[in-house]
Amino acid sequence: MWNEFKKFAFKGNVVDLAVGVVIGAAFGKIVSSLVKDVITPLLGMVLGGVDFTDLKLTFGKSSIMYGNFIQTIFDFLIIAAAIFMFVKVFNKLTSRKEEEEKEEEIPEPTKEEVLLGEIRDLLKQQNSSKDRA
């Protein structure tokens, strides 16, 4: 059982996925900071000093922190847009690289193609010898 787990855990796809999750979490923190520390204050200046995180409805001792919810939605939209742009650029670069590799690769002829070429050459030789006779 341990060997099966090691084989699974250290497969290339699992390790790639783990790295992707860690990098994604770090990227999410960067974008959240961008939203919280840069974009929201700028938006607050444009809208007259509004800070979404402090918006709330109070009912006695309880509060509904709808401003924090709005901020979380805003974070999500910016993170989604940033990831979309990253994936779009990545896919464009990857497709260009694949196209270049396809252009550079000249496939070797298959056995059938080699055999057909030899048959063609033999037929040419036979036809040229018949024409001389």
From Swiss-Prot:
Q: May I have one GO cellular component term?
A: plasma membrane
Membrane topology classification: Multi-pass membrane protein
Keywords noted in UniProt: Cell membrane, Ion channel, Ion transport, Membrane, Transmembrane, Transmembrane helix, Transport
- Chief location bin: membrane
Q: Which GO terms describe its molecular function?
A: mechanosensitive monoatomic ion channel activity
Localization, UniProt: Cell membrane
Q: Where are the transmembrane segments?
A: 14-34, 67-87
Q: Which InterPro entries match?
A: Mechanosensitive_channel_CS, MS_channel, MSC/AndL, MscL_channel
Quaternary organization: Homopentamer.
Q: Tell me its family.
A: Belongs to the MscL family.
Free-text function comment from the UniProt entry: Channel that opens in response to stretch forces in the membrane lipid bilayer. May participate in the regulation of osmotic pressure changes within the cell.
Instruction: Tell me the protein's name.
Output: Large-conductance mechanosensitive channel
Organism of origin? Bacillus cereus (strain AH187)
Taxonomic path: Bacteria, Bacillati, Bacillota, Bacilli, Bacillales
